[in-house]
Amino acid sequence: MEVNQLGFIATALFVLVPSVFLIILYVQTESQQKSS
């Protein structure tokens, strides 16, 4: 099976970007709860 490099990069970005965004939101809410 030949993997299309551009398709692989697009899939990786499609998965990684929302994951990083959710992690950042989670860390921000966690730090706010601890400080208050």
UniProtKB/Swiss-Prot annotation:
Signal peptide: none
Biological process according to GO: photosynthesis, light reaction
Organism the protein comes from: Thermostichus vulcanus
Lumenal side: 1-11
Lineage summary: Bacteria, Bacillati, Cyanobacteriota, Cyanophyceae, Thermostichales
PANTHER family: PHOTOSYSTEM II REACTION CENTER PROTEIN M (PTHR35774:SF1)
Gene: psbM
InterPro entries according to UniProt: PSII_PsbM, PSII_PsbM_sf
Name this protein carries in UniProt: Photosystem II reaction center protein M
Cytoplasmic side: 28-36
Physiological role: One of the components of the core complex of photosystem II (PSII). PSII is a light-driven water:plastoquinone oxidoreductase that uses light energy to abstract electrons from H(2)O, generating O(2) and a proton gradient subsequently used for ATP formation. It consists of a core antenna complex that captures photons, and an electron transfer chain that converts photonic excitation into a charge separation. This subunit is found at the monomer-monomer interface.
Keyword match Thylakoid: yes
Membrane topology: Single-pass membrane protein
